Regions:
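Short, flexible loop/turn segments at beta-strand junctions in immunoglobulin-like
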Residues: 138-139, 149-151
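Short beta-strand and strand-turn-strand segments in soluble, beta-rich domains
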Residues: 80, 125-132
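Short beta-strand/loop motifs in extracellular/secreted proteins, especially
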Residues: 106-108, 118
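Short aromatic-acidic-glycine turn motif
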Residues: 117-127, 181-185
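Short strand-edge motifs at loop-to-beta-strand transitions and within beta-strands
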Residues: 86, 135, 143-147
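Extended terminal and domain-junction accessory segments
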Residues: 1-97, 101-104, 152-156, 163-195
Length: 195
């Protein structure tokens, strides 16, 4: 080890990778990925999705229009732009089946607050493994999921894309229980005054 005297200087150099060393490897993706649709052994769900009392479609798309007064290509739910998107209304105890279809051109990590859902199928392929319970589901472009859950947590719950810029641009709706209301409303002056 070289020691420097008082006031001595030392120059160091760090090796740098050459151009292209950080590129992703070429070729097919590995085949050894876990597919939660078929992973594990089937188990009882505790409810029967075939006896759903509510059935909904949740089609995610895009179309030209205006949002907050700005023109653009905006997210839609069942063909409608926020705030004119459908609200999914349930009653406590309902067995709910929902088909989520994404034709928007981008991936959306969809997140339902207040509930866990079980994935029944992806692109028409039935789940055969352990029940795939989740509260967020990554829905790729051109993918369709069928999910189910029991409406067991009364409230007004947000259901939105967890890519928060997408949510801010209108990819948001609500799951609402009958008989539940709120004093809050969309738009207008907020009651709180942040510092």
């Amino acid at each position: 080890m070289r020691q420097l005297g008082r006031g001595g200087r030392c120059a160091t150099a760090c090796p740098c990778r050459g151009a292209g060393d950080g590129d992703a490897p070429a070729g097919a993706e590995p085949r050894d990925r876990v597919d939660l649709l078929s992973y594990g052994s089937p188990k009882a769900l505790g409810f029967d999705p075939a006896k759903a009392t509510r059935v909904f479609r949740y089609d995610i798309g895009r179309r030209p229009g205006f949002f907050d007064g700005k023109p653009g290509l905006w997210w839609t739910i069942n063909g409608h732009q926020y705030p004119n998107v459908p609200m999914f209304v349930v009653t406590e105890g309902d067995v709910v089946r929902m088909t989520i279809k994404n034709t928007s051109g981008q991936v959306h990590p969809m997140h339902l607050h207040g509930h866990h859902v079980v994935v029944l199928s992806r692109n028409g392929v039935r789940a055969t493994g352990s029940p795939w319970w989740t509260d967020s589901l990554n829905v790729e472009d051109k993918e369709t999921y069928e999910i189910a859950f029991v409406a067991d947590n009364p409230g007004i719950w947000m259901d939105h894309c967890h890519n928060l810029p997408h949510a801010a641009q209108g990819l948001v709706t609500h799951l609402m229980y009958t008989g539940v209301s709120t004093k809050y409303h969309l738009g207008g002056t907020p009651d709180n005054q942040p510092e």
